[in-house]
Amino acid sequence: MVRFLLVFLFALLVPEMVMAESLTSLDMTGTQRGIFTVLIFIISYGFVMTEEFTHLRKSKPVILAAGIIWAHAAILAAEKGVPTEQMHAAFEHDLKEYAELMLFLLVAMTYINSMAERNVFEALRSWLVRRQFGYRKLFLITGVITFFLSSVADNLTAALLVGAVVMAVGADNPKFVSIGFVNLVVAANAGGAFCPFGDITTLMVWQAEYAEFFDFFKLFIPSAVNYAVPAAVMYFAVPDEQPKETNEEAVQLKPGAIQICVMFLLTIATAVSFKQALHLPPFMGMMVGLSVLMIYGYFLKTKYYVEGEDGFDIFNKVRHAEWDTLLFFFGVVFAVGGLGYIGYLELLSSAMYEGLGATTANIMVGLISAIVDNIPVMFAVLNMGVDMDLYQWLLVTLTAGVGGSMLSVGSAAGVALMGQSDHKYTFFSHLKWTPAIAGGYAASILTHYLING
């Protein structure tokens, strides 16, 4: 559920994203060994993209690829006579990024797990189900809720939470579930694009200081257009019917639920304040927030202790963090970093941004994000050291954030909902609406040009 709190977490953690500014690549892209590393990365990411079918956790092939890529990078550095210290500096650059990332995400995941255990998300799901909305009204409500929820949480959590509502209400109507899930994927990805806390790629751009915090809100209207265009087209295909009555009972929040939600928001504020005001790494602010949660957990466990029950155990919440996700990011950071050290990011930058121009290249980034996860794509763009103005950085933030909506496998939200839908929402049921989603993609780019260009 927490794979991407991801969504404002990663970018806060990368203090110096532009490798080209501080580290020199080997410029050995034409060697057999260099080409081999690219093939290794492609093969490993092929396994990531087929995780739904192979059930091989995405972290496993990417970590292996990262190790192989850096082993070959070290050999290439030795062959070129690069000092060991220089190679270590490039490697430690990636290590520093990942260490801060892991600690930051671990705290966020622990908070999300704590809120889930206190029935925060289940209570919201129950409330929506008990309202007994018609299918078309529910289509609009769930889409809007997902759009705004994903701007402060992440697209995966928002999609799974609201997706449970769609499944509960539309269990007997596969058509509604299918269209409703497409709607949620588009809404979740669009909602994360305009807020620095809404998507990892958005925060990566903010952390790299290519845009100020409030600059991203210039993308609100383009993001809304990106969602509204396909939603308007799909609305008329939604069954104009009333779902069957449900006997859903209200879910009660457990003691401390509201307090933990407030502490999570304060923890986020602390992390941002540590970075903005004190110039300290934001993961330190997150760790302070974790310590507060741990102390409050002790209070909950002692005050509400029931014999025979474990009670609130903060270390269980840490234990149930999504370690597959944390290790996946390890693989992404080191694999992309290794390719960058060999020289492939400079080569890609020359081909895309110098050959095609910034606007075309940034639009292509969104299209690539429909096939490849947007995090390594944006990580690569930032490490290219491309010289762009604010308009272009906001454009690539928008396209990388919403481009994944065009295919069900293009974002974490789509992949997760396919697994949740009991075969009612599939790759091909999503593909049916790709033209409408592509229309929203084009309309959002045009809107961005008209408003911010």
Locate the predicted segments by residue.
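Membrane-interface alpha-helices at helix entry/exit sites of multi-pass transporters
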Residues: S126, F133-T142, A171-N183, A211-P222, ...
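Re-entrant/interfacial helical elements at transmembrane boundaries that shape
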Residues: L124, T157-A168, F181-V182, C195-E209, ...
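Hydrophobic transmembrane alpha-helices of multi-pass solute/ion transporters
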Residues: V38-T110, A123-W127, R131, F283, ...
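N-terminal secretory/membrane targeting signals
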Residues: M1-A20
